[in-house]
Regions:
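N-terminal secretory/membrane targeting signals
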Residues: 1-20
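Core mid-bundle transmembrane helix pairs that form the ion/substrate translocation pathway
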Residues: 220-283
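Transmembrane alpha-helical segments of multi-pass membrane transport proteins and ion-pumping complexes
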Residues: 42, 46, 50, 72, ...
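Structural signature of hydrophobic alpha-helical transmembrane segments
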Residues: 33-40, 129-137, 270-280, 324-331
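Hydrophobic alpha-helical hairpins/lids featuring a short glycine-rich hinge
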Residues: 122-164
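Transmembrane alpha-helix boundary signature
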Residues: 80-97, 117-121, 153-154, 175-186
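Cytoplasmic-side transmembrane-helix entry/capping segments in multi-pass membrane proteins
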Residues: 65-67, 156-164, 298-307, 354-356
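Conserved small/polar residues in nucleotide/adenosyl-binding loops
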Residues: 415-421
Length: 425
């Protein structure tokens, strides 16, 4: 019925004997997968920066670029100091241990670097610990990048960077411990292959809270409820950013196979990559069609967000769907995102780049789709979606309100007209 799934099944049930993979060879290929995929995901930081720079007005370009390079750097240090430990070290049902603070390679790895003859002990772990840390860290940075774009053009830089510390050091790792860290959601069978909820919905919930607390940009919404479009300064740059994100997503999803040491692993990665690509295509096509129907013209910003929505939607289950189903999942993600953009305007929630529709809404849909088209239990998937909201929304609100009441969160009204004050504390 489904040729690609048949191939995977055949590898499991075939009576043909396959030579055992040498542990050292598997270690090398698995580690390479983590490093190469991590580099691709790190390149997505540039994609977010270009996308956001294209969507904001010219006077705010430098500020948004500053936030993007700073948040990536903060994510690296926060995840090194505490985030990785809270997410992966001695995780119980809810949170990891601080005993793994100040991440380091394993003792066997350090011994090998010092000249010990313990290759076998290293190879048996399956991959190098530093490569795993790097791969996980760039995912952490992605989550807070979502907040940056949504809250652009009216949030002060320093308060945002303080929130980035909280997001990458605590909020994201705690939810990650519940899932990828083996906590209570993992125990009940929650499935999120590469992070539709763990990365994108978590970032999307924080972005939604931030946009509500900040309020809209000056002039965006009139008292009578009408919307004044605020055009981005550079749509070619936004389009470039979208293509960079699309490119990097092959590492985001493909690397989440977490192994490349066998023919089965490589086949699975190939299927993940194809499904990822097709879902993005589906998101664009559906968004473009809806744009023509709803607005009587094709809107580039809708198309760009359709691509991202398709990518986000398939991220929860690129390993579980066949190719056609991936197009459906991505297409529905593109449709939901298009409708959500209009809904936000109705609610007067000003999301500069469409991050909330493309990451939160599409992320929720993609997570639930695993329970519809994949092997996940729908109600378990729904539990994971709700758990993300229950954790992220109140914590984000608390910290945003603390920042608002202390150092101040929003640039005062006249600073929308003057770039230097955007940098002010």
């Amino acid at each position: 019925m489904k040729f690609t799934l048949f191939l995977i099944s055949a590898l499991f049930v075939s009576n043909v004997s396959y030579a055992a993979v040498d542990p050292e060879v598997a270690y090398i290929f698995n580690t390479f997968l983590f490093i190469f995929s991590g580099i691709l995901v790190m390149f997505m930081a540039l994609g977010f920066a270009m996308l956001e720079a294209g969507f904001v007005r010219k006077k705010n370009t430098s500020a948004i670029l500053l936030k993007n390079i700073a948040l990536y750097s903060i994510a690296g240090i926060s995840f090194y100091l505490v985030g990785y430990s809270l997410m992966y070290v001695d995780v119980g049902s809810y949170i990891g241990s601080l005993g793994g603070m100040f991440y380091n390679p394993t003792g066997d790895e350090l011994a090998l670097l010092d000249g010990a003859d313990n290759v076998a002990a290293i190879a048996d772990t399956g991959y190098s610990a530093p490569s795993d840390w790097f791969f996980q860290m760039v995912f952490c940075a992605t989550a807070v990048s979502i907040v940056s774009g949504a809250c652009a053009e009216r949030i002060k830089v320093w308060p945002f960077l303080i929130f980035a510390v909280i997001m990458t050091g605590f909020i994201y790792p705690i939810f990650g411990a519940w899932t990828w860290g083996g906590g209570w959601l993992a125990e009940i069978g929650f499935s999120d292959f590469a992070g539709s909820t763990i990365v994108h919905s978590v970032g999307g919930w924080a972005a939604l809270v931030g946009c509500i607390i900040l309020g809209a940009r000056k002039g965006k919404y009139a008292a009578d409820g009408s919307v004044t479009p605020i055009a981005g300064a550079n749509m070619p740059l936004a389009t470039l950013g979208t293509f960079i994100l699309w490119f990097g997503w092959f590492g985001f999803n493909g690397g989440s196979q977490l192994a490349m040491g066998s023919a089965l692993d490589v086949l699975a990665i190939s299927i993940v990559v194809v499904n990822t690509n097709l879902a993005a295509c589906g998101g664009v096509v559906v968004a473009v069609i809806l744009s023509q129907i709803m607005f009587k013209k094709i809107d580039l910003t809708i198309a760009l967000n359709g691509a991202i929505a398709g990518l986000v939607a398939i991220t929860a289950g690129p390993d579980l769907q066949n190719h056609f189903t991936s197009i459906v999942v991505g297409g529905i993600g593109g449709a939901l995102t298009t409708f959500a953009i209009l809904l936000l305007d109705k609610l007067k929630i000003d999301d500069v780049v469409g991050a909330i529709p493309a990451h939160l809404v599409a992320g929720i849909w993609g997570t639930l789709a695993v329970g519809i088209f994949g092997k996940g239990d729908f109600f378990v998937q729904l539990t994971g979606v709700l758990a993300a909201a229950i954790l992220v929304v109140p914590l984000s609100a608390i910290f945003f309100y603390i920042l608002k009441g202390t150092v101040g969160l929003r640039a005062v009204s006249y600073t929308h007209l003057t770039l230097p004050t955007i940098y002010s504390v």
